[in-house]
Each structure stands twice: as C-alpha cells, then as structure tokens.
C-alpha cells in the first residue's frame, strides 16, 4: 500500500503586494527591523527605503553591539522617500563622543536619480525630534537645518547647542519644543523664534542644573497661540533678582501654561484673547495677574501665593472654570473672595493637601452676600483631599447649600482618612438641600468644557 506523503509548501503571499501596502506593513515594526527586510529577497531590497517615518532610538542591545550609530549613518545614505513625515533620533548616555549624528543628518540627500540632491533638512522633513543625552559637549545643528522649508514640528532635547546663523528661515514651522537645550548666547532663541512666521505652539523647558546662557527668555511671536514654559531656580552668581527671566509679547495667545519657581521674574504683556491659564507660580506679580482677567479657564497652584495678587483683578468676567491647589487652612475664606469675583463660574475644583492635625482652626466668617456664581451659574463643584476639619466642613456646606443650579458635586477623602472618619462625609450629603447628590469619592479634578 503506497503511503501518501504530504509536502507543505510555504507560499509567499506578501511579496506580491504593491509597494504602498508593503510600506504600511513595515511602519508597524521598529525602523531597524524594517531595514533588515532588505536581506529577504530582491523584492524587499528597496521597500524599506521608502518609509515616510524613521525612528532611531538607542536601546541596551544597540549600545553593546554599537549597531545604532552604524545603522543611523548607513540608512541615511540609502533612504529614498520623497518626504519624511517624521524623523526621530534618540541617543542615550552610551553614545560615543567620537561620533557626530548631526553630520549624518546633514549629509543625507534627497532622492533624485543622481543621488546628489539637496540636503534632507532642506527639502523633505515635516517632523524632527532630536534627543541627545551623551556625555560629550552640546553639539550644533547643521546650518541647513535652519532653512528647512518643509519642517512643521521640531523637538530639540538636552545636549543640543542652539546656534542660529544671521539669516534663518523656517517658514512652515508650527510647533517647537526646546527641552533643556543650551543656547549660544542671549539672542539665539530670539533669532530662532523670529524666523517662524506661522509658529502656533511653543514649549520651553529650562534645566536648573545647567547654565543655558540665557538670562531673559523673550517670546515675541505674533502668531503664537499656546505657550508652555517650565523652569526652576536658575540664579547665577551675577544674577540680578529684579531681572525678568521670561518676557512675552504674544498678542494672539490663547493658552498659557507656566511652571516657574521664580514667578516674580515674569513680564506678561497685554493678551486680550487669552482663554486658558495654568500656572504654579511661587511668587506671581501684579503684572502677571492682570492679563488673567479675560480668561475662561484658570488653574492656580499653589493658591496661597496668588491671594495677595487677587486684588489686582476686580472681576473675572469671562471665567467659566477654575481649579486651585490649596495648602493652607487660613486661606479658606479667600476662596469665597475669589468666587465673588467670578460671576459666571460654572465649574469650581479644589485640590487640597492641608494636614488635618496640629492646626488651630481659623475663624471663618460667612459672607454677607452670596457670590453670584453660586446663586446663578455653578454646576460642578469638587473637593479632593477632604480631611473633615470643622472649618473645612463649613465652607463646603456653604457652597453646597447656596449653589442653586448645581448638577454634580464630588468630594474625595484624603488618602490618610480612616474608615471611621469617612463616616463624617455622610454628614455633607445630609447637609445638601438641593436635589443633587454628593458623590463621595468621584472628584475628577479636570476641566470639563
């Protein structure tokens, strides 16, 4: 009896797919793995070279084999895509200082048949992220980088020296992120920003442990819609405490996020279109507070540093949502002072980290008149970090009882609350006279509208 032997033949159904579909498949794997497909067959040899996104991210295995730097250099020589949607280079502290990844990028060429087309950074990158954490000195970007016509999003991080030539033009750049970079001099960032006529979003992070050669960071960008600025104590031995560290002239700004431990060094010019402000200034100035009068969304942290300057604003006439971080009990009365200036407030969020022990309760005087926002507009009230002290309970009770249009209320206990103490929260629910129920552990602490 003849035995029937079956032979299974693996059929390659992928290679017959069109190039566009193969490129989409390779985009689902790391760039290094995509490039390795060049050894599969002649059909695959050139497919990866058309990838519109390249990611070079150093890993532990790359460091041991020294492959990431070789791969970075070689792949730029062969890449042929007409346009790079994103180029991401992320090299860690193990990157040898005798290599220069910037030169590799500078030498990369666009893909005409002659292979001598214009530099990659001149013509065909939309989104560039370059992060360098090596142990060497900060390195300069190539001059061609400052003339890239297609660049729309840019992130420079850590050991990058921003040395801007006299003439510079980034006509398409809309988003810029400068993370702990070093600037050649005081004017380098000014020249860079002035070359971006359509810049919409600027994010700046300054490292307190690194001298970045800038005393006053100036942001003068008429087109800017959002500014994120983060910095710590950056005083130098020759620093004048009265000198501003941030000066902004952004008349069309809509959103301002500032995290700065030297808030009194801010100079914010007139911003009539400002909608959202998030800040954790330690020492805000009156000049900083005044432009906030037109905002719709406001987050103040810590609130105790803002109280002395609240008088600078008579009325937050457009404010719809307010989130504050509370750290002192004697500021409870100031909450109602703030509410009295927010006639259209719909959402009021309090994030409290006040300790419940070793404290003499402050005398809280109920205001003679109910803030207009409570009687007419407030819809959402949340208190996160409730500890059940008597003065805290009184002000929460006052807000709940006088908020005639309240739809939802959330109160979350402090993490140190015991089971017995949590029973006290039930008292708050019984105090509430409106149909709204108090959600005892659902404070979300986020803007709603």
From Swiss-Prot:
Keywords: Leucine-rich repeat, Repeat. It comes from the Eukaryota. Residues 364-412 form the FBD domain. Residues 11-59 form the F-box domain. The keyword Repeat applies. InterPro entries: F-box-like_dom_sf (IPR036047), F-box_AtFBL13-like (IPR053781), F-box_dom (IPR001810), FBD (IPR006566), FBL13/AtMIF1-like (IPR050232), LRR_dom_sf (IPR032675), LRR_FXL15/At3g58940/PEG3-like (IPR055411). It holds the Pfam family F-box. LRR repeats lie at residues 60-91, 153-180, 182-206, 235-260, 275-302, 327-352. This is Putative F-box/FBD/LRR-repeat protein At3g49480. The lineage of its organism: Eukaryota, Viridiplantae, Streptophyta, Embryophyta, Tracheophyta.
